[in-house]
Amino acid sequence: MTDKLWGGRFTEKAAHWVDAFGASIGFDQQMAQEDLEGSLAHVKMLGKTGIIPQADADTITAGLQHLQKELAAGKLHFTVENEDIHLNMEALLTAEIGPVAGKLHTARSRNDQVATDLHLWLKHRLPTIKEALTNLQTVLVGQAKVHAATIMPGYTHMQHAQPITYGHYLLAYFEMFQRDWERFDFTQKHTDILPLGAAALAGTTFPIDRTLVAQELGFDQIYHNSLDAVSDRDFALEFLSNSAILMQHLSRMAEELILWSTYEFNYIELGDDFSTGSSIMPQKKNPDFAELIRGKTGRVYGALMGLLTTMKAIPLAYNKDMQEDKEPIFDAYNTILGSLHIFTGMLSDLTVHEKRMAEATTHDFSNATELADYLATKGVPFRQAHAIVGELVLKGIKTNTALQEMPLSELQAAAPQIQQDVYAELTSKAAVDRRTSLGGTAVSNVLKEVARDEEMIASH
């Protein structure tokens, strides 16, 4: 027999370096509070059902509550020899109250215990992610309201396409982040399921009351299959998938802000708090924090792919491979929360160069679709109108003349249907204002969407 809590079967003590390789206490101690919460609920159930004497349950409860206070004060010390947070807590409890601590593990396995800890850990933190998303959405809506009529180029293939408003652009990301919010909300439901009571994999012979434990821990549901309860990491994969999609959205917007802050674009300027300088070039103002968010996206993608790969060939039920589920979750959580906070501050603090944005739409031929649509309203088939305007654009590029600068006679030579009223249609403002179809960039639409989105935020 060795000195491990599970050591009855073993005769040889493992070398310290072997223990260190197998230990998870270096990272799963982040679940210390959740481990104590789960144990308190479990021992309450053991006492109430008579599985252990109530006096023993009371002693264990007092010991666990003392450990909670010690944890809050930063006084608990964990060891590699006890390998994980569960055995460390049991060892600390035994040191506190003696052998009666061994009764706590009645009708429980580390398999359902660790699953419960991880469920609780995410259950406690998902609301924080949703709140951070809501804060970012609030900034987006506020800025969209201010810039509902701020005209800028819209792009496809990174080429000027049609004029839009900066407010319309911001609300596109609002929609993406709303879907992120809804995904995390849905994952919260899948996280709100209690595994405890499944024991190692097959349930237990003791007359446990899983409903009581669920009520104590605030779980809405209970796993109905003990094998599934200890094997399931779908909720963790959902969280990482949601996190990866969220970081993709942040990264796409970060990329645009980085480009737009360059000398060549000069659409925006990031605030000093979210920029850095160069150690050699005095003029530099680098968008480091936007770049960091773009870079950290790969880190979260890696967390998702890592856990997907870990889980892809694991037979039921628990296997030691599943110890690798926690670090990617902990890291992804910290990464997305930090990124959301930085991004919210960065958007609040940036300066929009409205004049420069508007100027960028004046000689870029992004009003070509307006002229084609104009001809279509005059009875010219759209495909023919498209060809006519394409030829005018080519001519304008060669002569450095915008469509709205071409004489009426020149336009009429290409299409006799064109009249003087065409010039009113060719301004960027007109192009924006005419896009009143549902979801379009018209200022009136943007303001309606702002009102709708404000209501959506209030419903969070």
Swiss-Prot record:
Subcellular location: Cytoplasm
Major localization listed first in the record, in broad terms: cytoplasm
Pfam families, alphabetized: ASL_C2, Lyase_1
Catalytic activity field: 2-(N(omega)-L-arginino)succinate = fumarate + L-arginine
Disulfide bonds: none
GO molecular function, one term: argininosuccinate lyase activity
Signal peptide from the UniProt entry: none
EC assignment: 4.3.2.1
Pathway it works in: Amino-acid biosynthesis; L-arginine biosynthesis; L-arginine from L-ornithine and carbamoyl phosphate: step 3/3
InterPro entries, A to Z: Arg_succ_lyase_C (IPR029419), Argininosuccinate_lyase (IPR009049), Fumarase/histidase_N (IPR024083), Fumarate_lyase_CS (IPR020557), Fumarate_lyase_fam (IPR000362), Fumarate_lyase_N (IPR022761), L-Aspartase-like (IPR008948)
Family: Belongs to the lyase 1 family. Argininosuccinate lyase subfamily.
Protein name, per record: Argininosuccinate lyase
Species this protein is from: Lacticaseibacillus paracasei (strain ATCC 334 / BCRC 17002 / CCUG 31169 / CIP 107868 / KCTC 3260 / NRRL B-441) (Lactobacillus paracasei)
